[in-house]
Amino acid sequence: MKKQLFLALMGLACLTSCVEEIDTRNRYTFMGETVGSFLEKNSELYGDFNYILDRAGLMSLLKAYGSYTCFAPTNDAVERYLSQQDSIWRASLQPGSRKEVWTGITSPRLEDLTDSMCNVIAKTHVLPKAFLTTDMEGDVVPSMNLNDRFLTMSFGVDENLHSVMYINGARLTVYDEEQENGVVHTVADVLNPSTNTLPAQIAEMPFLSIFSDALTRTGLEGTMQLYKDDNYTEANKWASNADMSSGALPYPPNRYFGYTAFCEPDSVFHANDIWNIEDLYARCRQWYPNATNPDFTSPDNALWQFVAYHLLDWHLLYTRLVCYNVTGKTGGVSFKSENHFARTADRAEHYETKLGTMLKIMMPRSSDIIAPDENGNMREYRNTIFLNYSKEVSRNSVPATPWDVRVGPKQVPLNVRVMDPAEVLADTLHYPGFSQEALNGTIHLIDNLLIYDDDIMAGYVLNGVIRIDYSALVPELTNNHLRWYDGTAGYQFTSDVGFFMPNSWSDHVKVFNDECRLSYLAPRDGFDEYQGDLCICKGQFDFAYRLPRVPPGTYELRISYIGGADRGIVQFYVDDEITGIPVDNRIYADNPRIGYVADNLTDDNGVANDKQMKNRGYLKLPSGYYAPYVGGAARKYTHGVRLVVTTKYFSRDIHWIRIKNVHDTDSGSDFYNHDFIELVPVSWLRREDIPLEEKRQ
């Protein structure tokens, strides 16, 4: 009955808001069991939570017409939560504590909760749509809760090797209890209802005391306070002539800001003989000797530079750090990242940090290293996410200490492991009260010191193809849950899913005329692009992207695109300087002007043909990901190509790439299908010790 009611009322809607305004007028009272009556009927299990719902005014809502998901914590969970939060607050008031940690809870007694805290806790556990566990895929629950927050999902196994699902780190103990107006899932812990910003969330965790102190003293906590742009008023608009078929696409539903902090726990600092902020600053002066300003809040201070390198303006969940096992489905669109990659294809992302330097995040799927970590646990490199991973240190042999790799005169750590949050949550001895998700960002714990050094990065980490998906260049696509979109950001469609990017929505994009329609199309299994998604620009397009900063040096800048009869003639600019002659995007790679020849039609596996194409300024697509059109490696796909835009010296300054349609007879139907960029050090291109297949990845 519930599903029939829901479909009957919602079937005509082509899009819905993920946080709906719930009409409480003319409520229909069900004769059967509702979510609210079910909870009340089982008060011996949910009585404390029922009290909170009543105080917040939500119990009557859960007894009335609608469609809801309720994650219901047990009485034990509520009692434990109140005691823990009260203890955290009281401990922060003791002598020697750096500052008060305000949890909103100042008593372990349920009756002492304020109305506002009851409201926050209650709304955290209720979603305005009904979802069974079979509806939940990926890394977030498919709708925001009534607090306008996404809840994270993770999976594991219990002591009997049975599958277990976690919501915001809380284990589902009983699930999929369907009622007339929704579904109830029982959770073993209260879901973190924190409205803390990222710095405040870090401050609440005692095992991050040194990092939190450094974050505060440098003033960098002030750069991570934004959450939502309340001046953004275009959520309900649609842009005409925006998709590949000249159809309309919606504007983004919101403009959220987001951040990620990679944090060393105190135990990591202690292992490196760092016990307080003075010790850390002394070491920072060794790692950043040119940062000589003694003022901690100066960008020219060594401590400031150390902390800034840990911070991103992208809100990255653990399962979105790299494109691995990413799934999504909305309407008629489905996506599984593993359908798009070779099993041993490394997964890498590159982001500019608040230091203005690049951080590499990688899961080395091609590695066969298996070794015990510091606790004796056997770990596989191929299933581990690293920061600043280097192939060089294990190219010819396994490092002597695979989980503590250090190089150079300063012994800079590489292959810094990002700890799996499921493991961190389970280790309550070392990480009590770990809470990964803040209001506006994510906290990741790392197992070693994270240090930036130009020479080390250029020589060990970024000495290869730096491939960056266009969607990763624009933080707002990640922060608003549009990149790798899975139907949870606010719209539901029956076919393709995409969003128009209005001018001024992101500081990382410039649009130079009103006819330009720059849009993002979310991944689907039928797309041939890297990571399954793409950006398009329709009409008389003229737009630019901000490039991430790389270590100073000479690089080959490449751009990947899919050609076609309606793809225009493009003039490229880098930093407002014309680069070469206009490029005809209307031809495919097997056109003689590009010169593609399939590897299996040559006598040397395509080596000579690669050189011929490169002399014309082109490369075949990489072999490390798949194009469904050819049923195999994208290298075989003749509709796509990589273009060498320019070879130039990139300084520490900010650089832009501009893409302009100069097709004089375009009637507005041309569009530019762009996929990723590559920045490749010229020094790496000259190396002869790199295997051919590695260079083709």
Residue spans for each PLM region:
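Mature, structured domains of secreted/extracytosolic soluble proteins
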Residues: 18-697
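Sec-dependent bacterial lipoprotein signal peptides
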Residues: 1-18
